């Protein structure tokens, strides 16, 4: 799990910053918390900054995380995930899993790019 999760609302976007070691079970917990904050605030744009995750995330964990996100039914929500280059690749796997399941998501390496996409 990210050892630290910070959530704030700024300019109509739920900003979540996560850091520390990755654990699939804890990642599911923080994802649920982030989506719930958006629903409580009536905000359908979420930016998750995961650049401070310190461990490699396996392909199977990315797939399972994607399936869990789909199970939360975020279809009215746009989600931008910012990660380090090595976390985003290979081939934007997490993004492909989610887009193929009709989730409005973008996985990028820069906050600017995430904000541009969210405010499109």
Features from the language model and the residues they span:
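Amphipathic, Lys/Arg-enriched alpha-helical "gate/interface" segment within cytosolic domains
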Residues: 1-120
């Amino acid at each position: 799990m990210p050892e630290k999760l910070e959530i704030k609302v700024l300019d109509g976007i739920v900003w979540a910053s996560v850091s520390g070691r990755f654990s699939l079970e804890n990642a599911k917990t923080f994802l649920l918390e982030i989506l719930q904050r958006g629903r409580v605030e009536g905000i359908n744009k979420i930016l998750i900054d995961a650049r401070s995750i310190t461990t490699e995330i396996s392909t199977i964990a990315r797939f399972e995380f994607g399936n869990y996100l789909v199970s939360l039914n975020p279809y009215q929500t746009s989600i931008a995930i910012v990660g380090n280059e090595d976390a985003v690749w290979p081939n934007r796997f997490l993004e492909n899993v989610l887009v193929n399941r009709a989730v409005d998501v973008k996985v990028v390496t820069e906050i600017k790019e995430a904000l541009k996409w969210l405010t499109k």
